[in-house]
């Protein structure tokens, strides 16, 4: 409310490149990030006339405790009908989060600071390891092409 009265301000939402892509066993995560992206886009349009900027930060691979959520999901799906797929996805995630394959959280803090200081911030900031590359790949490929790319990562190069 005070931002509207001041006719200026910034709202910065932390999403993920996961708000633009999708992976097997990730519906729970990707759905929340897709929703945050859509909500932020709508909010940006609604608040523009009040001088309020809405910014989305889309981190790539960042060193966090995301693995705790993944461990819980593994416990609940490892022996069911999705067990084999889940095991493959665990390997993909383990590879993605090997040392050197992720960025430190400070990268995101720096981007947030940049957006706050900017007089005219971007609507989106992709930051962290692989963020820009993942988003560029998603924009370049058709849905079916992206599906094939993801499944090659999961199943290996011989997958269809």
Task: Say what each PLM segment does.
Residues 1-7:
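A short helix-coil junction within the Rossmann-fold of NAD(P)-dependent oxidoreductases
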Residues 13:
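Rossmann-fold scaffold of SDR-type NAD(P)-dependent oxidoreductases
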Residues 16:
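Residue(s) in the substrate-gating loop at a strand-loop-helix junction
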Residues 21, 42-52:
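Active-site-adjacent segment of SDR/Rossmann-fold oxidoreductases
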Residues 21-28:
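Active-site loop immediately N-terminal to the catalytic Tyr-X3-Lys motif
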Residues 32-35:
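Active-site helix of classical SDR
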Residues 48-99:
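C-terminal beta-strand-loop-alpha-helix "lid" module of Rossmann-like NAD(P)-dependent dehydrogenases
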Residues 54, 93-140:
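Core catalytic loop region at the nicotinamide-binding pocket of NAD(P)H-dependent oxidoreductases
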